[in-house]
Amino acid sequence: MKLTAGILGSLAGAAAVMAAVMYKTANGSHLKTHTFTLDKMKGMKPLTIFFISDVHRRLIDEKLLREAAVYKPDAVLLGGDLAEGGVPYARIEENIKRLTALAPVIYVWGNNDYEVSQQKLLSLLRAYKVIPLRNESVQFAYKGENVTICGVDDIRMMMDDYEAAIRYTDADKVNLLLCHNPDIHEQMRESDGIDAVFSGHTHGGQIRFGRFGPYELGGTGTVKKAHYLISNGYGTTKVPLRLGAKPETHMITLCGPDEPFS
């Protein structure tokens, strides 16, 4: 009996330690850097983007944002799940405030964003001059240059309309695509002229055991001739724990092949 109690106590202790490690991991802040070389940007000034998705219940770390500010980003792309049900609106507002202090913010909805009052969420976005994209595009100006940024609404909520989002793009010019769910890759065509696509949603599986998890780890690659980035995201869902899939944000430099650092 004493032996059984000892084993159970050891297991409980190990579980508590593991939970503490997973909680600490989930609350970390990591900034990853990437360079995407685009042929269409030959002769254009580089575009620097801070990308963050899946904030959920977290308050974005000010130290992380100070680190990001060193890169002087031209834009912030906010890839959905800024909020979820039960998150205080004051915290959502503070996150928006912190991001807009870094650079102009362009936002698309994620599935969890539909768990909060849309009227209140839109009011906060407008108050801080965030550009929300719902199956539409915007001409984004920076350093005397222009690119088109397309935003697709959430796929899981069946709010997406990819064709509407890319309706006014010119395949010969620089086109960026923002969509919370990476399943958007399936709707893309090479002829659409998308140069880079940014998504989150999967959390990199959030809790992984080696190679095994509910989703693949986030990463970069190419799809339909476009660069893609799928982020592990910044926050968590269901439980505030992570294992094998660190939270992450991203600083991406888009540049032409003529740039010396590309």
Annotate each predicted stretch with a short phrase.
Residues 6-7, 12-94:
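N-terminal active-site segment of His-dependent metallophosphoesterases
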